[in-house]
Amino acid sequence: MASKTGSRRWMLQLIMQLGSVLLTRCPFWGCFSQLMLYAERAEARRKPDIPVPYLYFDMGAAVLCASFMSFGVKRRWFALGAALQLAISTYAAYVGGYVHYGDWLKVRMYSRTVAIIGGFLVLASGAGELYRRKPRSRSLQSTGQVFLGVYLVCVAYSLQHSKEDRLAYLNHLPGGELMVQLFFVLYGVLALAFLSGYYVTLAAQILAVLLPPVMLLIDGNVAYWHNTRRVEFWNQMKLLGESVGIFGAAVILATDG
């Protein structure tokens, strides 16, 4: 019995570490995909989301926070810094208005950003630490869970009100309209769990199972989004990387919630 308990705990710790790796490395992929995206835009004489002088500071801050989080040095503080950096850069891009996206794409982009910020707040609370020396901050974790709940509300909303998102699910998942409605209900129920703070671990476990097929079949079909929906290639790659980061946050809450 003791050996079974020990092996189960070891497996949970291993999965939790995997979630931490995926989430803490997310800013690296975000910076790389942004650089590639803005390089493509420069060839077409189009501006980046953030003016160039500030863009370098923004990416430098993101890489700095991600590096310290990855090495586990003051992870809580730098996770909080990463959340703040992402919030400021997203606000600057939104206010700047250099690039105009469709409403449905804005929801996809900003909802994922909100979820990643929530994941960093969960990490800043002390969740996902293998050897926790300080008590966990329940207020930070609750705030992060609310951000993840807001993301799920946006996804559920898009399934009902965005033609592009509905068609993506209809074209890539079996079951047709019934499957779309099933995902809508699942996203709604999971959102309620995260927003209310009840059954968070169970909700995170369900979300961790739900996200991989969605990432592989829908977000992972880059050619579909680029050719059919005119989403820039590296923008879709950035969204895919953020989905992986959200999966990492769900894994952390599922194993250490």
From Swiss-Prot:
Listed GO CC annotations: membrane
Membrane-crossing residue ranges in chain numbering: 21-40, 52-72, 77-97, 110-130, 139-159, 182-202, 206-226, 233-253
Membrane topology summary: Multi-pass membrane protein
Pfam families the record matches: TMEM101 (PF15111)
This protein's UniProt keywords: Membrane, Transmembrane, Transmembrane helix
Entry annotated with the keyword Lipid biosynthesis: no
Top-level taxon of origin: Eukaryota
Cellular localisation: Membrane
PANTHER family in alphabetical order: TRANSMEMBRANE PROTEIN 101 (PTHR31034:SF2)
Reported function: May activate NF-kappa-B signaling pathways.
Protein name from the UniProt record: Transmembrane protein 101
Taxonomic source organism: Bos taurus (Bovine)
